[in-house]
Design a protein with these regions (language model features):
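Amphipathic alpha-helical segments in well-structured domains
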Residues: 59, 101, 225, 258, ...
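Short glycine-rich or small-residue beta-strand-to-loop segments that form or flank ligand, phosphate
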Residues: 83-88
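Canonical Radical SAM [4Fe-4S] cluster-binding loop centered on the CxxxCxxC motif
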Residues: 18-61
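Binuclear metal-ion centers of metallo-dependent hydrolases, dominated by the metallo-beta-lactamase
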Residues: 258-280
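Conserved alpha-helical substructure of the radical SAM core
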Residues: 46-82, 96-99
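Short, charged low-complexity linear segments at domain edges
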Residues: 2-27
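Conserved AdoMet/S-adenosylmethionine-binding subsite of the radical SAM
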Residues: 93-196, 203-243, 248-255
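Conserved hydrophobic residues forming the short capping helix/wall of the S-adenosyl-L-methionine
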Residues: 70-73, 108, 269
Length: 280
């Protein structure tokens, strides 16, 4: 299966299903992946298969490369709709993330003041005050919440270290509405060893298939959607973005959520008074 490792520190522009013409900012090494999650659906592949040998780009390198690219795009008359922190892993892991945010906002204001600054994050670093404050300064603070079920999170998102979804939700509330929730909905069955299944004798709500060697990773059912929606209502985001698999994944057996499933979930979010988009 093919996976994507993005150039660093600037790549694109690319057309984003959710954001428009996006110029990417990758704060991770150009030859590998650095992430506090290890999602079975990640287009960049598994962490252990893409260990980087190059260092993180420096703050100065990011600013210089971004300015060079924006100058080039301005000369060509093609400015981006959005400057997006994405790439090979979790951008907020970079030790100079807050300072780089300030540099990017300054360059945006200089070269493309109509463009938005967006950050795609898995939410694992929002307990850091400097990261929280930096995310408050961007236009689109897009934070992941695939489910509120801790076993599903362990089996599918594979967080490194301790991850308490209830604490994450509380920290999301602390953005006081300056937050966009992003959620991956998917279907399918995978081999247990591929999910790294962490089962418990009791309280395991993940669903078994007829083949006990396989595990369902479907989070489109009511047992997942209903508590997720209640968490979304409590967070009170400015918007919700739901989406499904769009590219090849490192784990076989994953399936896209259907248009009908995504539309039904989207409509429930909208009915709760929260703007929501679905990407298929």
């Amino acid at each position: 299966m093919s996976t994507i490792i993005y150039p660093s520190p600037v790549f694109g522009p690319v057309h984003s299903r959710r954001l428009g013409i996006s110029l990417g900012i990758n704060l991770l090494p150009a030859d590998g992946k650095v992430c506090s999650f290890d999602c079975i659906y990640c287009e960049c592949g598994f962490n252990e298969d893409h260990r980087p040998t190059l260092p993180l780009p420096t703050r100065e390198e990011v600013a210089a490369k971004l300015e060079e690219k924006l100058q080039q795009m301005a000369a060509e008359g093609q400015l981006p709709d959005v400057l997006t922190f994405a790439g090979n892993g979790e951008p907020t892991c970079h030790p100079n993330f807050p300072e780089i945010i300030d540099d990017v906002i300054r360059l945006r204001d200089q070269y493309c003041p109509k463009a938005k600054v967006s950050v795609l994050s898995n939410s694992t670093m929002i307990h850091r005050q400097a990261v929280h404050d930096a995310l408050m300064r961007v236009d689109n603070n897009i934070l992941k919440l695939d489910t509120v079920d801790p076993i599903y999170i362990n089996n599918v998102d594979h967080p490194n270290g301790t991850y308490d979804v209830n604490l994450i939700i509380d920290r999301m509330k602390a953005f006081n509405g300056h937050i966009i929730i992003q959620t991956m909905f998917m279907r399918g069955e995978v081999r247990r060893q591929e999910t790294g299944v962490r089962r418990q004798e009791s309280g395991d709500r993940s669903r078994e298939t007829g083949d006990r060697s396989r595990e369902s990773v479907d989070n489109t059912g009511e047992e997942y959607v209903c508590p997720w929606l209640e968490a979304v209502k409590a967070i009170k985001p400015q918007q919700v973005m739901i989406y499904t698999i769009d590219r090849e994944t490192p784990t076989q057996g994953l399936l896209k959520a259907t248009h009908e499933q995504l539309d039904a979930i989207r409509d429930r979010v909208i009915a709760a008074g929260i703007p929501c988009t679905a990407s298929y």
